């Protein structure tokens, strides 16, 4: 214990001696020797301030300061060393540094000795180590406190010295500033007087004023303000440089001394020497490297500009493509809308035609229905309409004709340009008939007298001029009349020629419809002959040059018969000519009133031309007369046949039964306006009801040979009519679901049948027909379904798929006999796979 106490007292005495040496080592002369001249002191002050700023910028917290103290150096010591290094003239400073170094070395040695002793004491006993640690900690804390107080006293003494120096130097600085400002103002005034002699009130430029103010501010500012201004300027330069380098606001406060990266050359340009050597440009100077980097940056900038231009061009092209696609899409949509509009028009046209058919079938047809049927019959079927279409206007009132005009407009819109000439001609004729009827109503005569009631001179002249002319002739006449009206003249009867021009349109429309009607008749007759295999002959021959009679072998023999035959033929021809002359004469008498001699000459010339050239168009009356003449001549008399000459299956109808059927058909036509359907047609139509898209007609019949019936001698056996359907569909089992889909479906299979057998003339109505399912001898997968009814019907059989039937009515099974129809409907069972 005594040794430990002795050691502790020795260490305490050493530390006290060291503190005395540090305190009393410097003499007052040495301390005052630090006060140098004002210029040197100001320079030293600036350096110390800049160094202080650096040290403050790069200094860390208290932990780092303690680390520096333990590392035998501190910021304050470094500062003292720098200031004493600059003032190497004073010997006192050097002595002070030497003494301080010796004291520090001694201190370090003592600390090392104390550490070694502590280690030894730790090894000797654990309790003594703990106490020694506490003592060492207290010693170090006390020494640190002493050092801190020492620094504070030194800094306060330095501040006092600085204030004293400022007070001494401030009057001298003020005098220097005043002298400088006076010399500058005198020089500026002399320069102004030399250059123009301008007065000071005129004033210098704004730049000179700013410069003067800046100079004045610099002359009057204190050293602290000057230092702050220069630091701010330097900081602004560094900030600008950093902004140019691309630094963000986060890194703007970093400096070479203060940055988290530990980079002492943070603000400088980084040069990767290894990369430069690898590229082979390590020998270049800094200026060349800068030029090279600048050149590379320019190239990159140009490349970026090119890339930007290409991108803009691509965007422009993309916008153009999108615009083109949009235009194409609009065109497609317009086409779709057009097709939809056409479909809508076709639908309305179909509905209008359907309404017309229904009205015609019910016997309440309107004029537009008859016209629509006439114009559609030209293309649809081979039915022949013998009358011209304008004959449907006979007997109509003004209201009916006005309704007809509206219906014609609707058909013209719906047909979209089809049959325009036909509807225009009908419109012209209808408007003319309406005007005639209104004139008759105004004159007080009914529509029955309209043909005979026109007594004006213009109408008789018009009828005499237009009688028997073709469409081309009427068109030429129309052009002549129009040119005559346009030419004018003093003796021209404008009213007559205008009425003539007004009526010629109507006659042109009638002539065009008549010629169209004749063309349609010729085409349909030609098609009928082609279907029947008849050799084509001239259509509607009127005048045939009779070939010269064969020279009789003996004129005496059979001369009486030839004379009789020739006389009869001549008589027939004379009668035909008389009828035609009477008809044409009557028509001319009705139509012609008074005519001028010029028009009579024209008519005679036209009749002469007609006599020379044979007519190519026949009217309905001409055809009737021709057929009547042929019938009278005996060419239509059928040959008489005996019963033995008839085939065995010929069905003979008695005259009374035929007459009754004819009278019944006539009564039905008078009541409904259309022939009713037969019983078998009704049966077929009833069997076709409800036929879906997954059903098809099934008419494959199996022949039954060697079948004899007991009632065959009493009734003639006949086969019944039938209308059968087969139901097909897809079976979506596991295999089909795996290998097929809705776009590529599996093959259809038969799922059921619907048999409709017609027995309208069954003798025994109480006995219902029956069906029998028999196996097929050729193939076990098929069966034969046979139907048996009774007299007068034979059995009938069909070959079907041999599968198990579904007899539940829920699955569509039906077996009934009603209204002369035997129905057998069934579906096959579906087998479900179950584990």
Swiss-Prot record:
Keywords for this protein: Coiled coil, Cytoplasm, Developmental protein, Immunity, Innate immunity, Neurogenesis, Nucleus
Subcellular localization, as worded in the UniProt entry: Nucleus; Cytoplasm
InterPro entries documented for this protein: Cactin_C (IPR019134), Cactin_central (IPR018816)
SMART domains per UniProt: CactinC_cactus (SM01050)
GO BP annotations, alphabetical order: anterior/posterior axis specification, embryo; eye development; innate immune response; mRNA cis splicing, via spliceosome; mRNA splicing, via spliceosome; negative regulation of innate immune response; nervous system development; neural retina development
Keyword Cytoplasm: yes
Sequence ranges of Basic and acidic residues compositional bias: 14-32, 66-98, 132-146, 206-238, 543-553, 578-604
Coiled coil ranges: none
Top-rank lineage group of the source organism: Eukaryota
Compositional bias per record (Acidic residues), positions renumbered to this chain: 605-617
Biased composition (Basic residues): 1-13, 33-46
Primary localisation category: nucleus
Gene Ontology CC entries for this record: cytoplasm; nucleus; spliceosomal complex
Region (Disordered): 1-244, 537-617
Similarity comment: Belongs to the CACTIN family.
Function recorded in the entry: Plays a role in pre-mRNA splicing by facilitating excision of a subset of introns. May be involved in the regulation of innate immune response. Plays a role during early embryonic development. Involved in the formation of the anteroposterior axis with important roles also in neural development.
Protein name: Splicing factor Cactin
Name of the gene this protein is made from: cactin
């Amino acid at each position: 214990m005594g040794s430990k106490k002795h050691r502790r007292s020795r260490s305490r005495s050493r530390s006290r001696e060291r503190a005395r040496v540090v305190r009393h080592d410097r003499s007052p002369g040495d301390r005052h020797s630090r006060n140098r001249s004002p210029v040197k002191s100001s320079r030293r002050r600036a350096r110390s301030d800049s160094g202080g700023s650096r040290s403050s910028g790069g200094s860390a917290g208290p932990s780092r300061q303690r680390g520096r103290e333990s590392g035998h150096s501190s910021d304050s010591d470094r500062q003292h060393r720098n200031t004493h290094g600059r003032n190497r003239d004073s010997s006192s400073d050097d002595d002070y540094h030497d003494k301080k170094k010796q004291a520090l070395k001694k201190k370090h040695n003592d600390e090392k000795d104390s550490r070694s002793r502590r280690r030894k004491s730790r090894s000797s006993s654990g309790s003594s180590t703990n106490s020694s640690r506490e003592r060492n900690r207290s010693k170090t804390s006390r020494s640190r406190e002493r050092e801190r107080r020492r620094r504070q006293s030194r800094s306060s003494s330095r501040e006092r010295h600085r204030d004293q120096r400022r007070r001494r130097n401030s009057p001298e600085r003020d005098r220097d500033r005043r002298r400088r400002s006076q010399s500058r103002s005198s020089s500026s005034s002399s320069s102004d007087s030399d250059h123009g002699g301008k007065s000071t009130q005129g004033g210098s430029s704004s730049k000179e004023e700013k410069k003067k103010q800046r100079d004045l501010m610099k002359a009057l500012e204190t050293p602290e303000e000057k230092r702050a201004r220069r630091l701010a300027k330097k900081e602004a330069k560094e900030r600008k440089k950093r902004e140019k380098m691309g630094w963000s606001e986060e890194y703007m406060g970093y400096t070479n001394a203060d940055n988290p990266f530990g980079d002492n050359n943070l603000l400088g340009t980084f040069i990767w020497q290894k990369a430069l050597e690898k590229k082979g440009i390590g020998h270049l100077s800094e200026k060349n490297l800068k030029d090279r980097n600048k050149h590379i940056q320019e190239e990159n900038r140009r490349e970026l500009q090119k890339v930007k231009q290409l991108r803009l061009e691509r965007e422009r092209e993309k916008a153009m493509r999108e615009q083109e696609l949009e235009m194409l899409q609009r065109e497609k949509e317009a086409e779709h809308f057009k097709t939809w509009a056409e479909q809508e028009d076709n639908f309305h046209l179909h509905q209008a035609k359907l309404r017309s058919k229904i009205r015609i079938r019910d016997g309440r047809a309107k004029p537009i229905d008859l016209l629509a049927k006439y114009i559609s019959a030209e293309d649809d079927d081979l039915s022949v309409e013998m009358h011209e279409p304008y004959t449907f206007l006979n007997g109509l009132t003004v209201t009916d004709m006005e309704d007809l005009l509206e219906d014609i407009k609707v058909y013209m819109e719906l047909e979209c340009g089809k049959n325009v000439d036909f509807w225009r001609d009908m419109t012209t004729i209808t408007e003319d008939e309406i005007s005639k009827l209104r004139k008759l109503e105004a004159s007080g005569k009914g529509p029955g007298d309209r043909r005979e009631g026109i007594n004006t001179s213009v109408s008789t002249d018009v009828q005499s001029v237009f009688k028997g002319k073709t469409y081309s002739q009427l068109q030429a006449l129309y052009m002549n009349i129009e040119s005559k009206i346009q030419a004018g003249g003093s003796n021209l009867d404008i009213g007559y020629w205008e009425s003539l021009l007004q009526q010629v349109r109507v006659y042109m429309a009638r002539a065009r419809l008549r010629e169209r009607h004749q063309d349609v008749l010729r085409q349909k007759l030609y098609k009928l002959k082609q279907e029947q295999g008849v050799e084509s002959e001239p259509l509607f021959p009127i005048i045939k040059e009779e070939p010269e009679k064969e020279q009789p072998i003996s004129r005496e023999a059979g001369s009486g018969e030839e004379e009789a035959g020739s006389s009869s033929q001549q008589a027939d021809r004379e009668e035909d000519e008389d009828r035609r002359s009477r008809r044409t004469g009557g028509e001319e008498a009705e139509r012609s009133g008074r005519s001028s001699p010029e028009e009579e000459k024209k008519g005679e010339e036209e009749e002469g031309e007609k006599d020379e050239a044979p007519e190519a168009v026949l009217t309905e009356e001409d055809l009737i007369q021709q057929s009547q003449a042929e019938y009278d001549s005996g060419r239509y008399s059928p040959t008489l046949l005996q019963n033995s000459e008839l085939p065995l299956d010929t069905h003979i109808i008695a005259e009374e039964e035929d007459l009754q059927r004819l009278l019944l058909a006539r009564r039905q036509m008078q009541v409904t306006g259309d022939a009713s359907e037969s019983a078998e047609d009704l049966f077929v139509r009833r069997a076709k009801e409800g036929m879906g898209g997954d059903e098809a007609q099934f008419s494959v019949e199996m022949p039954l040979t060697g079948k004899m019936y007991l009632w065959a001698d009493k009734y003639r056996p006949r086969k019944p009519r039938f209308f059968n359907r087969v139901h097909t569909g897809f079976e979506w089992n596991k295999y089909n679901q795996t290998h097929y889909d809705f776009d590529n479906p599996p093959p259809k299979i038969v799922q059921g049948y619907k048999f409709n057998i017609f027995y309208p003339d069954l003798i025994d109505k109480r006995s219902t027909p029956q069906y029998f399912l028999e196996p097929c001898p050729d193939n076990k997968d098929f069966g034969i379904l046979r139907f048996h009814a009774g007299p007068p019907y034979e059995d009938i059989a069909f070959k079907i798929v041999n599968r198990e039937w579904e007899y539940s009515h829920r699955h569509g099974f039906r077996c009934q006999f009603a209204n002369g129809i035997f129905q057998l409907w069934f579906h096959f069972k579906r087998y479900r796979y179950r584990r």
